[in-house]
């Protein structure tokens, strides 16, 4: 690199005022989208840190992130992390992963940049200076601004179409416990302890209504154990619980002074042992190493802080879950992923108590080799469960392709879609709306921090908005509920004020009122299945292609330069439109079996386990 006298390494903590006096005799490298936009706005020539990473190196970083996030499995330290059969480090591995993605990317980029440094003066943000020390560089701090190092579950955010509310996890738990006390008198069944029941872990009451009703019809008692979110939060969820006689144990049902005292005592003891464990720098330096360089010195205080923040609550959750399992002795436990902390705890303790655990497929899973690795890491597929109930033959074929234990996997369908199959699908085009389902970068892959990808997402949005306007079609944009906003509302306003952008809206009604469904995102949404069931053609603009999961037939992939003509053809040519729908129905029949009766099949299978075990 032929650098000037100064090199400025910029991230979002550095303002224009921090660097304006360095413009003439400095080279600039930006490390995130905000800093890139800031320099672009001020017409400052700069390089982007992404440009120092080769395409295949993004795969290397992603693989390393899986390994770093599973640090707790290292045989030299895993025993020290156990509490009542549960590895405490595993309970926040997803949170650590989300924290590490931008950190490891930045560290890898600094390694690449530093290999060609030939300048004397290097200025950087506080966090980049800290990373530089791991490489024996003393960068000069150019800004006093602190980097926001909050962790994913430090706060809970509640979004509506009109406002957003953020609560600390502590305040959220207080409100949750209060709401349980409020609803407790209305759920008489919660006072019972059944002898023959299934335990549902973290199931959404309203979305699970058909499943709860079917259990009731088959005289199977259900205990709904929800710790991350309340089982009852409004009149509809209360109605479902009362109607299905579902048992909802509250915090007050399970807690007592002895448990609280023990949690406090064990937390303090475990914290002391973790402090000692974290002094084993030789072990951790080898775990957190990339390209032959360790970043343990940088990570150590952050990992310890995260562990400390989550420790007492984790031990409390273990004690509560142990109480519910021991008290009710369910015939089986149902979960929808193995990654959530409640699910992990229930899975570990159930194994010891010899209670079978069944994993139900939840959502549209990736099918490529890279996608399978992500599924495995996020524990969306079976790792430790006794059985895995999938939606159809498509997932069975994938399970076989990746050498999963086929004796434990059963294709029974999706209870979540039964009601849709029993609706009469529209056969004629009655609406002129276009529905755009977006999933911009949600920061769960290192490539989603690539500035080019963010620019590409926004350029694709603009193209879709302009196309809808030119075709004189009303466009409704439905944002993914867990997505951070990427200025979709502002972009829409600049192009066409009639474009409606929503985050919280009934998805079924949006699909029903649309003529064509357009997908723009890094993964296939289950809403695509909903649209196909309702006879809506689904098209997709390429974005986030790194896993290669988009040739499965679920939707038509259309390049940007063909988008307008293909969309016009779908709208105006009935034969072409019908052919797309028929092709997508073939995919649907492979992906979802037992259409309209999956709930009965699932409950029938569980009924056998309740009566005779696995």
Sequence positions of predicted segments:
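Catalytic-core helical/loop segments in enzymes performing group transfer/polymerization on anionic/lipid-linked
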Residues: 1-614
């Amino acid at each position: 690199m032929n650098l000037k006298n100064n090199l400025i390494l910029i991230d979002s903590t550095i303002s224009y005022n921090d660097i304006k006096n360095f413009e003439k005799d400095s080279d600039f490298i930006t490390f995130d989208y905000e800093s890139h936009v800031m320099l672009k706005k001020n017409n400052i020539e700069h390089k982007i840190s992404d440009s120092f990473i080769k395409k295949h190196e993004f795969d290397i970083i992603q693989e390393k992130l899986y390994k770093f996030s599973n640090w707790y499995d290292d045989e030299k330290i895993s025993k020290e992390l156990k509490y009542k059969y549960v590895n405490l480090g595993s309970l926040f591995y997803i949170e650590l992963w989300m924290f590490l993605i931008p950190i490891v990317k930045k560290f890898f980029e600094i390694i690449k940049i530093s290999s060609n440094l030939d300048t004397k003066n290097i200025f950087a943000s506080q966090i980049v200076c800290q990373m530089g020390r791991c490489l024996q560089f003393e960068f000069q701090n150019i800004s006093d601004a602190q980097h926001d190092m909050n962790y994913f579950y430090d706060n809970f955010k509640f979004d509506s179409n009109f406002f957003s509310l953020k609560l600390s996890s502590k305040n959220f738990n207080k409100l949750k416990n209060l709401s349980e006390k409020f609803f407790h008198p209305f759920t008489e069944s919660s006072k019972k302890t059944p002898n023959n029941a299934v335990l549902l872990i973290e199931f959404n009451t309203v979305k699970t209504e058909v499943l709860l009703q079917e259990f009731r019809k088959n005289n199977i008692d259900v205990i709904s154990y929800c710790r991350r979110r309340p089982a009852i939060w409004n009149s509809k969820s209360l109605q479902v619980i009362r109607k299905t006689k579902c048992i909802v144990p509250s915090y007050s049902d399970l807690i007592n002074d002895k448990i609280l005292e023990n949690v406090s005592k064990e937390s303090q003891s475990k914290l002391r042992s973790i402090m000692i464990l974290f002094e084993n720098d030789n072990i951790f330096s080898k775990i957190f190493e990339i390209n032959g360089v360790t970043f343990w010195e940088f990570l150590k205080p952050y990992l310890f802080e995260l562990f400390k923040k989550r420790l007492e609550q984790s031990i409390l959750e273990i004690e509560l879950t142990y109480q519910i399992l021991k008290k009710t002795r369910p015939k089986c436990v149902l979960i929808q992923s193995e990654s959530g902390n409640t699910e992990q705890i229930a899975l570990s303790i159930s194994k010891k108590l010899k209670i079978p655990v069944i994993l139900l497929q939840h959502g549209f899973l990736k099918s490529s080799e890279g996608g399978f690795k992500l599924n495995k890491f996020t524990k969306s597929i079976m790792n430790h469960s006794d059985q895995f109930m999938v939606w159809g033959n498509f997932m069975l074929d994938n399970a076989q392709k990746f050498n999963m234990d086929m004796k434990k996997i059963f294709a029974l369908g999706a209870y979540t879609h039964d009601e849709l199959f029993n609706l009469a699908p529209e056969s004629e085009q009655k609406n002129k709306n276009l529905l755009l389902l977006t999933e911009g970068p949600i920061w769960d892959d290192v490539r989603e921090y690539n500035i080019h990808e963010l620019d590409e997402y926004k350029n694709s949005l603009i193209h879709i908005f302009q196309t809808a306007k030119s075709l004189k079609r009303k466009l409704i944009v439905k944002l993914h509920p867990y997505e951070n906003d990427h200025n979709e509302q502002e972009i829409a306003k600049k192009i066409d004020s009639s474009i409606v952008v929503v985050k919280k809206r009934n998805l079924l009604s949006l699909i029903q009122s649309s003529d064509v469904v357009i997908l723009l995102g890094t993964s296939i949404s289950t809403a695509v299945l909903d649209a196909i069931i309702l006879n809506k053609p689904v098209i997709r603009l390429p974005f986030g292609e790194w896993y290669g999961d988009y040739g499965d037939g679920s939707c038509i992939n259309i390049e940007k330069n063909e988008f307008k003509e293909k969309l016009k053809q779908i709208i105006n040519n009935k034969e072409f439109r019908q052919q797309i729908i028929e092709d997508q129905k073939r995919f649907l029949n492979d992906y979802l079996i037992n259409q309209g009766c999956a709930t009965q099949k699932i409950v029938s299978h569980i009924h056998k386990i309740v009566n005779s075990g696995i």
